[in-house]
């Protein structure tokens, strides 16, 4: 009985840990997206300020060029994290299925114990 309770707690902890990981990655994606949007705004403002919007132009602002590079890096990171989210969600679903399996097993074992106890009383 004791080891079964410990095992159930372990499985619940694993499910929660997987859930936390998914939320953490989703939070990172949201933050990176916000930062990319801010950089887009800054790029537009810098291009307006200088009057040059062609990145191939020789006098294109260095700040805008650096902001574009940073934004592109953020977008690549977002793409990578999106893949990680899918993997983390799959791991969470797997852990949830395993927990459900152990919970149903525990329910069956408790039902058997109750049946044995009630039969012993008769």
Features from the language model and the residues they span:
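Charge-rich amphipathic alpha-helical interaction elements
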Residues: 1-122
